[in-house]
């Protein structure tokens, strides 16, 4: 599906994130194709959006290269920074979050994955929209990260479960915990 979606608007497709899951899917086709351990998350935009990279922990290092550089892609440039004494690194595009074990919805994503994207592309207090809310994972992640949310779900069984999950998440936050 992501290939069709990406091809539908190549002029606005910018890049993809790859979610490496802890569980495979696609067992019914296992004799015809490899099991699927990843899902692609596509990023589209016309104008550069807010981007707050979620730094990854790595080994501390000091800068060892000269001050100026030349790149075939970017031309001449001046390096900035002096290394990473705390070991923090810019994120790569492969994210590892365990799959949800007990799901309400068949395509339910982990809250931590949604929190990652919400923190990457929004500021606290902003509104996050999910037009296919399913089990309300995005709403729970928005609450956990101090954002507001607008969600839509048209399937009555999922809507009921989603509203209960949001209620429980709000209660957890009031008790000083995170919603799940």
Placement of each model-derived feature along the sequence:
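S-adenosyl-L-methionine
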Residues: 164, 168-180
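Core catalytic lobe of class I
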Residues: 1-161
């Amino acid at each position: 599906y992501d290939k069709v979606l990406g091809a539908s608007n190549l002029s606005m497709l910018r890049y993809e994130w790859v979610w490496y899951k802890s569980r495979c899917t696609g067992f019914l086709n296992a004799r015809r194709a490899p099991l699927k351990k990843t899902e692609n998350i596509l990023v589209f935009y016309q104008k550069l959006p807010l981007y707050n990279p979620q730094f990854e922990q790595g080994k501390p290092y000091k800068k060892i290269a000269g001050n100026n550089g030349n790149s075939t892609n970017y031309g001449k440039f001046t390096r900035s920074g002096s290394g990473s004494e705390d070991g923090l690194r810019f994120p790569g595009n492969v994210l590892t979050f365990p799959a949800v074990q007990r799901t309400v919805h068949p395509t339910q994503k982990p809250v931590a994955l949604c929190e990652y994207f919400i923190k990457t592309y929004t500021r606290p207090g902003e509104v996050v929209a999910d037009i296919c809310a399913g089990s309300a994972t995005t709403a729970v992640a928005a609450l956990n990260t101090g954002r507001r949310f607008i969600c839509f779900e048209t399937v009555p069984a999922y809507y009921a479960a989603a509203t209960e999950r949001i209620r429980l998440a709000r209660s957890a936050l009031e008790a000083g915990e995170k919603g799940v």
